[in-house]
Amino acid sequence: MTDEFYHKDIFGAIIDINLGEAEDDESLPLDKKGREFNIFALTDAVGARDKKRAWMLYQGALAAGISAEEVFFKIVWQVKCLLIASKTANVGETDMKPFPYSKAKSFLKNFKSGELEKLSEDLVVGYHLARRGEGEIETLVEKILLSL
């Protein structure tokens, strides 16, 4: 028996030959140094309100092949966690896991009252403008990060 594996169409014709090569599993994107890029370092920088580190990590994410839209939704997730943490007294009142909740609670000291709501509004409005063709997600993410 050979290592060849044939894929046939409904007429019996061979359409693909796999010579025993393992298919690549989906792996995390790599940064310039060949390490796996950690997107949560970027969300931590957003929570810490460190605009320089957040922007640098954003550029690293783009260089690692992560789409701007994926980064955008991670930022939305972080802002949502911060808003939930700001409106609750403990993790029991939420559907969140204890670790992200405690991180969000610790990041709340970096934001004044109303700033999270404004940031959330800017993200939502900017996303819809970009979807209508009135801007780009890449530019929106960059503006949001630099306005922290």
Give the residues covered by each predicted segment.
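Conserved beta/loop motifs at nucleotide-recognition and modification sites
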Residues: 1-148
